[in-house]
Amino acid sequence: AIMRLKLVEKDISRIEACMGRYSIRKFPKAFVMANCSDLQEGLRTWFKLSSTIPGLDMAYFYNVLTYTGQDLEEKGTQLLLYEGLEKGLGQEFDRSLYSMTEEPECIYTIIESEYTHPDFDMIHKMVQWAHKHGLEPMECVYANDMTSFFAKDRTTYCLEIYMPFKRIASPV
């Protein structure tokens, strides 16, 4: 329970520091617990895994999307457990069963949304920021619903977004 609270504290600090700002950050190193077709399948898989591996409440759901310049399409959901958290899971967790994420450099931001997924305009703004900074975003977008709260008669989600890129020019 203490590890989970520390994760929440870290998430809240990151939200306060990064909300509405763009930066470059590596995608987190994590165990890929499952690749699912959507968030609903991800939740079912998480419940199934949780019955055999205690402590999986520390896993994160990353929605995977594709940005084409004209559209933003959902591709699935990854259930990720950040590296280092496996120490709190006990012997039931066999790390050899899971692949690790790659850690590409990404355009990074946290945004508020009415939905659990970013919309096209949110990602398009990230792409515009990237181009201004000599970066060429790839099509893949990862969105993590960090937390939500109720305000102004609606639920608001804090989405952590990673978008891998390649450099097309030297940074100024």
Which stretches of residues belong to each language-model region?
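A solvent-exposed interaction/effector surface
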Residues: 1-172
